[in-house]
């Protein structure tokens, strides 16, 4: 990880010094263990602020839409695929970007680690290739890194950036023996009533803070459908029907555009795994159209493009 | 404990279309309960929240003067959900009025002073309230010279046209009515932007206060003119707009710095505003 | 009996009960009051109405969500109305009856109790009184639990509270291990303890141990965040300070900080209609959201993220300070520090704003 940090700093300093970009978006160390803070630097001597570790789970593509500057952005595999879709959707131009690609071995799920510590507070966390070493008041724990990855990282099959201008390390081997849809298939087997109950419970704790929407790099609408008033599509209280509507509709708006970066689940203050909705639609898109989001800048997302041989009758 | 969120029920008595684009209508409301009217004692400059059940509430300046008894007047611009619903209502319909809210033009301080009123567009509503109040026989001698500069984009966009003409004919108030542009050959008043007309007519700042109400662009260009005429910041008074919901300083959304526009305002002097962030 | 010079309220003799009897205490309270306590839900703890005393879990340093929903529910139906124009009730709003029996929030932390006192200044003013907040305040007893081990993101002592602060509490409990000391702060607290059959007196040894725990807890919070210069800073100078640009970048305007914060109270009012019936409901809102200050005309004074991020911290650490002279609108609970997904740390803002030279 130190090697990554060095490379990112070197790239940032070089790009700013040579005036190849106006600003660099990366991460700086967080103020509490297992967190880092997205940072924007404009001067080469700020390069020292940049840092990389297994707690850089935020998707920096979230900060790109509609910016006008020349931007160097640090991107993991998932982030780079979001950037591809943002370029296709005219939210940012390829020429503006210098993508510092980071082959990623997965980000740590901070809440899972806190859960494992059972109320003991971590005061410092360091990592080796295979372990997290956690120190607190009167204890030290060594946890196996691979058991504490974010849910989406555990089943990631696109860890290497697909679009980049330079890589900070050699590409990492992609995971091949993962079933991305194991939990989705479990839900598919339920009866309609069971499924209704399942989603009621899943979304029950939602407090409609919209952090999931705000953290999503693909949710960039100037006025989100939940904020429209003429017409008003759904109520703003925590009524369960309105809450379910919000999550279902948002998932549909992301069909074919979501890269499972996991940001939504990561930011949710009450830990809702709304990614299950997105993965169901990801599975559908893959089965119907053979498409995986953002793999290539040559391929448009299936729901924003029309082919004469598309199955739907009403198109004709 | 009186519930400050509960509006007084009122009936729509008349609806007058004010402007040629039909986007501004003046509503005359009559209280259903006479005791509510007694509770609704207000001063010129205040506003109320107009409540349309099923749609919501909107903060609108009170256009009637406290001297006009038995009804309230509000001039409403159609911009969104609530105002559209209100525009579609008819005389006889019931809705709600919550208030009076906010502070008012500083009438105690204005006693014995000359008053210069500068208004633009449909921000003129509380200025109408102020003019009717001052011109009332009980009140007129409490104030010095009254000068009014009021403009709209075209003659058809002026509010309260008949009253404007009536005031124009009076000799105890000096009216300067203007429009930005017009092709109407019968237009006999000024043509020009409000800030320009203010500069040209140059009302004296001696012993005078200026009440300024208008769209942000008008205010922006009028304030330097007034300053140039010698009005110090403490004697330039304006009424601000903000997005509001509760109207009573609790929902937290209408603040400029430390001040809630709905409760500590909407009337502020320029001197007060200069102490606050320019975030409005 | 002695008088605490800070609040002038005589602090009554301390009672005590065995920790092992805690579940019985809760069950007895449950018979008389609507009882809420922290309950573990997977990896987080939140307040729930107890079905039985053994559900309570006081092991977490604090709950994920603050207890502000007790006084300020996230969604509250204010009024009901019919939309049938032909009816004689057309256009008339009726206040919705609320069922507010006497409630006890058991195990609330001192920071969250102080937060209610700070938010009181918003909802209970000389000119207007919010009936829903006030009725809930009046019907809810707060039995606080002192914090023996504050966590590293707590900073209550920097903002006028403390791990053992009695501000706003009816009872302050201290967990000594085998015993629990119960200090009565109000007549209501006394009544609740009577109903829980807690009548034993705390011994001197217990009182000494509680004091020692308090000192240790306060010491563990380390050095204070700087707040002494916030009042005197020029408001516009702080507003126009250059550091906002750097602070605001990471923010995603997600609203989590606002929703978990015990001193955030902003709300929205909406009418919702279904068929011929409707309600006027108020919901939590956040100055973080772009449409918070959006005018009907389309004008938005805070259309940029920087303006919104600045508003949050200027309000909490400056506007509230100037307006009410009660210190900052923050009780140091640390929830925003723990929950902000991009690690925007309000403690840094204390330093940036207090130490700003401009």
Language-model-derived ranges and their functions:
Chain C
Residues 116, 262-266, 341:
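Active-site-flanking alpha-helical
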Residues 106, 242, 246-252, 256-259:
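Short, well-structured alpha-helical interface segments that form or flank functional binding sites
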Residues 21-25, 257, 283, 345:
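General structural feature for long, well-ordered alpha-helical segments within catalytic domains
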Residues 227-249, 267-358:
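Ferredoxin-type iron-sulfur electron-transfer modules in oxidoreductases and energy-metabolism complexes
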Residues 1-234:
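Iron-sulfur-associated redox domains of electron-transfer enzymes in respiratory
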Residues 229-234, 254-262:
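Oxyanion-binding "anion nests"
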Residues 187, 256, 262-269, 292:
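Histidine- and/or cysteine-centered catalytic micro-motif in compact active-site loops
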């Amino acid at each position: 990880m130190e090697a990554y940090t060095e490379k990112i700093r070197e790239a940032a300093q070089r790009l700013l010094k040579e005036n190849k970009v106006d600003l660099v978006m990366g991460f700086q160390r967080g103020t509490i263990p297992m967190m880092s803070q997205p940072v924007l630097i404009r001067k080469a001597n700020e390069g020292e602020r940049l840092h990389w570790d297994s707690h850089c789970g935020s998707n920096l593509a979230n900060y790109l839409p509609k910016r006008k500057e020349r931007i160097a952005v640090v991107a993991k595999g998932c982030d780079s695929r979001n950037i591809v879709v943002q370029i296709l959707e005219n939210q940012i131009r390829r020429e503006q970007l210098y993508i510092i690609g980071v082959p990623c071995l997965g980000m740590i799920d901070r809440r899972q680690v806190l859960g494992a510590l059972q109320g003991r507070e971590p005061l410092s966390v360091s990592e080796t290739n295979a372990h997290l070493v956690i120190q607190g008041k009167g204890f030290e724990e060594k946890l196996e890194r691979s058991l504490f990855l974010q849910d989406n990282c555990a089943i990631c099959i696109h860890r290497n950036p697909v679009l980049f201008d330079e890589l900070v390390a050699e590409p990492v081997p992609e995971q091949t023996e993962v079933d991305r849809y194991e939990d989705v298939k479990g839900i598919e087997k339920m009866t309609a009533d069971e499924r209704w109950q399942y989603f009621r419970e899943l979304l029950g704790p939602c407090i409609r803070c919209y952090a999931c929407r705000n953290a999503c790099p693909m949710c960039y609408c100037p006025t989100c459908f939940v904020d429209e008033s003429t017409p008003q599509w759904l109520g703003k209280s925590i009524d369960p029907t309105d809450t379910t509507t919000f999550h279902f509709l948002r998932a549909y708006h992301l069909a074919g555009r979501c890269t499972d970066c996991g940001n939504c689940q990561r930011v949710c203050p009450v830990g809702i795994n709304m990614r299950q909705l997105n993965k169901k639609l990801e599975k559908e898109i893959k089965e119907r159209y053979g498409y995986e989001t953002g793999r290539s800048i040559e391929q448009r997302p299936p729901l924003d493009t029309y082919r004469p041989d598309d199955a739907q009758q009403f198109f004709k | 404990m009186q519930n400050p969120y509960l509006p007084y029920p009122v009936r729509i008595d008349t609806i007058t279309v004010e402007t040629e684009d039909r986007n501004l209508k003046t509503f005359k409301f009559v209280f259903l309960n006479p005791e509510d009217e007694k509770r609704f004692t207000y001063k010129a400059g205040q506003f109320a929240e107009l409540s349309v059940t099923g749609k919501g509430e909107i903060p609108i300046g009170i256009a009637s003067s406290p001297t006009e008894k038995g009804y309230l007047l509000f001039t409403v611009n159609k911009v969104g959900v609530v105002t559209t619903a209100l525009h579609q209502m008819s005389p006889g319909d019931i809705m709600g009025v919550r208030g009076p809210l906010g502070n008012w033009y500083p009438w105690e301080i204005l006693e014995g002073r000359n008053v210069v009123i500068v208004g633009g567009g449909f921000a003129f509503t509380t200025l109408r309230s102020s003019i009717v109040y001052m011109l009332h026989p009980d009140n007129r001698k409490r104030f010095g010279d009254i000068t009014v500069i009021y403009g709209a984009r075209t003659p058809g966009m002026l509010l309260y046209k008949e009253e404007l003409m009536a005031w124009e004919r009076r000799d105890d108030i000096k009216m300067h009515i203007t429009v930005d542009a017009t092709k109407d050959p019968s237009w006999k008043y000024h043509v020009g932007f409000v800030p320009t007309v203010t500069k040209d007519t140059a009302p004296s700042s001696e012993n005078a206060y200026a009440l300024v109400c208008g769209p942000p662009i008008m205010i922006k260009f009028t304030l330097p003119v007034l300053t140039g005429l010698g009005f110090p910041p403490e004697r330039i008074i304006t009424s601000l707009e903000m997005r509001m919901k509760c109207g009573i300083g609790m929902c937290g959304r209408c603040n400029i710095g430390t001040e809630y526009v709905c409760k500590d305002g909407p009337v502020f002097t320029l001197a007060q505003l200069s102490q606050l962030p320019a975030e409005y | 009996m002695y008088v605490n010079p800070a609040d002038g309220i005589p602090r009554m003799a301390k009672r005590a009960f065995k920790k092992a009897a805690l579940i019985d205490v809760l069950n007895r309270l449950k018979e008389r009051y609507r009882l809420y306590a922290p309950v573990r839900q997977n990896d987080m703890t939140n307040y729930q109405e107890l079905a039985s005393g053994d559900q309570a879990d006081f092991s977490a340093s604090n709950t994920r969500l603050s207890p502000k929903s007790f006084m300020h529910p996230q969604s509250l139906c204010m009024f009901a109305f019919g939309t049938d124009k032909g009816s004689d009730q057309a256009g008339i709003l009726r206040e919705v009856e609320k069922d507010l029996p006497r409630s006890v929030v058991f195990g609330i932390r001192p920071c969250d109790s102080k937060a209610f006192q700070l938010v009181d200044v918003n909802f209970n003013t000389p000119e207007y009184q919010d009936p829903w907040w006030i009725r809930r305040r009046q019907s809810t007893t707060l039995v606080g639990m002192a914090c023996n081990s504050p966590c590293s993101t707590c900073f209550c002592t920097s903002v006028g509270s403390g791990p053992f602060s009695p501000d706003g509490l009816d009872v302050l409990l201290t967990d000594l291990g085998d015993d629990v000391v119960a200090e009565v702060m109000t007549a209501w607290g006394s009544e609740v303890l009577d109903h829980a059959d807690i009548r034993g007196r705390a011994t001197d040894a217990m009182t000494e141990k509680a004091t020692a725990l308090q000192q240790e807890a306060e010491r563990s919070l380390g050095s204070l965040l700087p707040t002494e210069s916030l009042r005197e800073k020029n408001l516009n100078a702080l507003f126009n300070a250059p550091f906002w640009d750097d602070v605001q970048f990471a923010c995603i305007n997600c609203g989590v900080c606002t929703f978990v914060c015990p001193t955030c109270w902003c709300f929205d009012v909406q009418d919702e209609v279904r068929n011929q019936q409707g309600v006027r409901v108020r919901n939590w809102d956040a100055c973080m959201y772009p449409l918070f200050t959006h005018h009907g005309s389309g004008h938005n004074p805070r259309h940029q993220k920087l303006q919104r991020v600045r508003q949050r911290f200027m309000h909490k650490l400056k506007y509230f300070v100037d307006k009410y002279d009660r210190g900052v609108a923050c009780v140091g609970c640390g929830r925003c520090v723990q929950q902000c997904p991009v690690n925007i740390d309000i403690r840094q803002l204390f330093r940036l704003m207090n130490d700003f030279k401009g």
